Structures are given as C-alpha cells and as structure tokens.
Amino acid sequence: MTAATSVQPSPAPRQPGLRATFNPRKEEKVFLARGAHAFTLPGRRASVNVEVDVEAESDEAALDAKETTITVSYAEKGQESSWSAAKWIKLDRLAKTSQHGVVNEDRATYQQAWSLELLDEAVEPARAIWSALYAFWIRHKRSDRLAVLLKGTQATKVRSYVFEAGLGFKSPCETDLILLDRNAFWQGAGAPAGLHWLQTPVPTRGLFPYVLDFTQSTSPPVLATHPLRPPKPAPGSVVYSRYVFSCSQHLELVHIDVSNPQHFDAYTRWQNSDRVNHGWREKGSDEKHRKYITEKNDDPHAMGVLVLWDGVPAGYGEMVWSKEDGMAAFVGGLGNYDQGTHLLIGEEQFRGKHRFTACMVSLKHACFLRDPRTEVVVGEPRYDLDIIPLLATFLPQEIRKEVELPHKRAVFFVLRRDRFLEEGILE
C-alpha cells in the first residue's frame, strides 16, 4: 500500500480537480440545500436511507469532519425491512485528484480519500454500489473526482463494476486507490435496470444507428437532412425520474397521453389560463388542444411530456430534435443531435424558482441522457417573459443572442453538455 502523503488538503473550490460549480447569486444559495437523508431512487420503486455518524449543520460540514462514517441502506417498495448496502469511511490519508498528466505538480489538488465497503447484507451488488455512489455524490458536490480505497470481501466485484461501467478508473499514482468520476455517474454509467433516470429508452439505451432522413415543411419553414430519430416511448410511459433534494419530492416526466383524462384535462386547463397563455398563446377549444397533442405525438422530432411531482401533474414540457425544428432556419449552426426544450408550469402550488429550475434541469438532463451524441440543448423563450432571469441565473447556459422568429422575438439560450455535467444543479 502506498504511504499516506504529507501534502496538505487543497481548500480552494476552483483548483484543478475540484468542481467548477455554477453559483447562483449569493442570496439564492439556499437552493443548493441537500434535503432529506432518505430518498427514492429513479422509478420510485426503491428507496435509500443514509446515516451519517457526525452531527453537523450541513452535509459539507459532516464530510469535513475529521472522522466520518456514512452507512447506506436500500429498500424495495412494499417491503417492511431494508438491507444495509454499503459503508463509507473517511481515511486519514490524502490523495491526488487533479487530472494526471495535465496539471503540474505544484498546482496539483490533494483531497481526503475514503474507503468503500459493500456489506454482506448487499444481496444485489449492482444496486448496492449504485445506491452507495448516489448517496455520496449528492453530498460531495465539490469535486469532479473522489479517491477511494475498496475494502471488504466484495472489493474485487466492486472494482470490476466501476471500471467496466466507466464510473471510475485506477489511480495513476497510488496503486491501491481508484478514482471515481462524478460526471460519469450523472451520465447514468452503470445504472442497474430500472434505476436509470431515463426510465423508458426506446428501443434500448444503446446508440440508435445513424440513418439519413429528410424533413420538408412550409409552415414552419423546414428543409433539412438529419439523422433518423428513434421511436418515442408509448404515450403514458415514464420518460425520466429523479428525486429532487431541494424540494424533497420526486419529479417525473411522462409522455403525454391525449386519451388519458388526467393528462388532457390538466393540459387544457393550463393552456386556457391567462398566465400560461401569456407565454404560450395556445388558449382554445378542446378540439384545438387535442389536435396539438396528437400532432406532437405523430411528429418524430418532438415529444410532449407532463411534469409530475410525487405523481401529481404540475406542468407540461417538450423535448425536440433541433436540426429539423422550425426555429433552426432562423438561428443556424445546429448539429445533427442538438436538442431543444420548452416548459410551462401550470399548477400554482408547484411554481417558484426551486421547482421551476428542477423541472428545467430535468428536461435538459433527459435530453443529454437519451443520446450521448447530443452536445448542445437550446431554448428560445420569448424575450419579454419573466422566466428569462431564472434561466440565466440557475442554469449554466449562455445567452447566445436575441433572434427574430416568425411568431416572436426570442432569447436564444445554449447549454453545452460538458458545462451542464460539471455545473448543473443535479444534487
């Protein structure tokens, strides 16, 4: 085993190897609170309970304590008992976490290493590992990488799982340590069946093959070659599922089903409200709304989704492939796998910056997850809407320009994959 180094920990949050977090304005930083110690996993069929043996004012303070042990338990829905999955223990040891071969030694970042042990009660190793990583990353938001010493009888199994899934890699300078990568986790690497945030991949979670396709339309004006798009999940399917810690509730995106009265009634009520109509301008009869949803369902480039909090409808959003979208001709430069989003929050009880941001982040996350070739997700809200400051404040995206579209003047937002994974508020 490599001896512990005497180098002091690196405190500054912007040093190499530490996460370049996107910070809202100072008065808004309460948004980053972690929430409960118990949370539901994607799909809402299992939950995780986290016990930290240190009393502290925040998760960061607990992790900073000299000695900290984190025990992670897992339970399936409907079961009275849970089983202990894994244990994290903070080590009295520093390890290099900045990028090896890139950062000079005098600038290198050293952080406290942790041990990870899969417990004997862990009857499903893959779920235990995933739950343990989830429980840790939501609390350890400072770093892109974490140095880990694998311990216990299942250490070899954990090591193989992490390496084969791409969740981490062997430390180049300390032979007994591995380095876990935060961004790989939030891309869904190694997620067991049913626990991926993307709940309904069609036809599979693998890459859909490149097949040349063509779209021609006069209203809106479209004349574009682009990749053939994969089929969408069936209406009513859960597309995306994630527990949102700042709100202590579970968010889902469900493919809207025009034949489902709950879906249709909520959608029509929202679009016919004066507040939503100010932004979307889709007020009208049931026939008009049914036609709109049906056309979206028949359109291979767009998918409408309901936003639900703990199963209660809250809003409506859209995920579109941008290359063949109606606004592409007016903004230019969109790639084959670039995507775009639209969002409205219809229910008053689910409004506010915390929930709106969580919904928008989830839509963007779903876009990046459904095709790893997507490098950019764009948005083009009308320039005078009051959501513009929220979008600029709570998402790490850039305002590219204001652009004239046939039906509105819009602010053109561009969100890049690498920045979203590094700085997006997913914890």
From Swiss-Prot:
<dbReference type="InterPro" id="IPR019432">
    <property type="entry name" value="Acyltransferase_MbtK/IucB-like"/>
</dbReference>
<dbReference type="InterPro" id="IPR016181">
    <property type="entry name" value="Acyl_CoA_acyltransferase"/>
</dbReference>
<dbReference type="GO" id="GO:0019290">
    <property type="term" value="P:siderophore biosynthetic process"/>
</dbReference>
<comment type="pathway">
    <text>Siderophore biosynthesis.</text>
</comment>
<keyword id="KW-0808">Transferase</keyword>
<comment type="similarity">
    <text>Belongs to the lysine N-acyltransferase mbtK family.</text>
</comment>
<feature type="binding site">
    <location>
        <position position="342"/>
    </location>
    <ligand>
        <name>substrate</name>
    </ligand>
</feature>
<feature type="region of interest" description="Disordered">
    <location>
        <begin position="1"/>
        <end position="24"/>
    </location>
</feature>
<keyword id="KW-0012">Acyltransferase</keyword>
<dbReference type="GO" id="GO:0016410">
    <property type="term" value="F:N-acyltransferase activity"/>
</dbReference>
<comment type="function">
    <text>Acyltransferase; part of the gene cluster that mediates the biosynthesis of siderophore ferrichrome A which is contributing to organismal virulence. The first step of ferrichrome A biosynthesis is performed by the HMG-CoA synthase hcs1 which catalyzes the generation of HMG-CoA and CoA using acetoacetyl-CoA and acetyl-CoA as substrates. The enoyl-CoA isomerase/hydratase fer4 then catalyzes the conversion of hcs1-produced HMG-CoA to methylglutaconyl-CoA.</text>
</comment>
<keyword id="KW-0843">Virulence</keyword>
<feature type="active site" description="Proton acceptor">
    <location>
        <position position="380"/>
    </location>
</feature>
<dbReference type="Pfam" id="PF13523">
    <property type="entry name" value="Acetyltransf_8"/>
</dbReference>
<protein>
    <recommendedName>
        <fullName>Acyltransferase fer5</fullName>
        <ecNumber>2.3.-.-</ecNumber>
    </recommendedName>
</protein>
